[in-house]
Design a protein with these regions (language model features):
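Conserved alphaE helix
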Residues: 107-115
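Hydrophobic residue at the +6 position relative to the catalytic HRD Asp in the kinase catalytic loop
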Residues: 128-133
Length: 173
């Protein structure tokens, strides 16, 4: 996709598509000065996930994780009419990309375990798949805003960690 996207009448030039998730497309955009991530909510079916109001769920999850102290890109603007979210851009490769290059820092696991120490007592899990994490400046950022009710089979130790090895299998979604 080329061209522009808007949030509350502010126009952003699309640099590239960063990825597609269960709930939206994320684009790297610029206002001519700064780069951002603009997430455009989509309503495509997902066979293993039920959505209600996707935009409100995303905003609720962001606020929940922010209050817990999870390192994430800041939410900068919301356009409810267009279902667009503007986020801070965290520059760098995802953990998934780094793992494919054979790069793994033990501190990343420690930082995820620290996140788990905040999430589990609150009864929550996040999507631990490595595409959702970017190390930048010594901090591991969770770049998704999704969180779900805690279930042991989906926690980091029982599900997520299998993807955090250099030989991690591809996730099929």
């Amino acid at each position: 996709m080329c061209g522009t996207l808007t949030i509350n009448d502010a126009e952003y030039t699309v640099i590239k598509l960063l990825g597609k998730g269960k709930g939206g497309y994320s684009y790297l955009v610029t206002d001519g000065t700064t780069q951002y991530v603009l997430k455009q909510i989509h309503h495509e079916p997902c066979e293993y996930y039920a959505f209600g109001d996707q935009l409100q769920a995303e905003l609720h999850d962001y606020e929940t994780l922010r209050k817990l102290g999870i390192s994430m890109p800041r939410l900068l603007a919301v356009d409810t009419l267009q279902e667009h979210i503007l986020k801070e851009y965290i520059a760098g490769q995802t953990v998934a990309e780094l793992l494919k290059e054979g790069r793994m820092e033990p501190d990343w696991l420690k930082q995820v375990q620290t996140m788990c120490g905040l999430l589990y007592p609150a009864g929550l899990n996040i999507d631990y798949y490595p595409t959702n994490f970017i190390p930048c400046g010594g901090t591991l950022y969770y770049i998704d805003y999704e969180c779900n009710a805690y279930m042991e089979q989906w926690d980091f130790e029982h599900w997520g960690i299998q993807y955090w090895t250099a030989q991690a299998p591809e996730r099929t979604i």
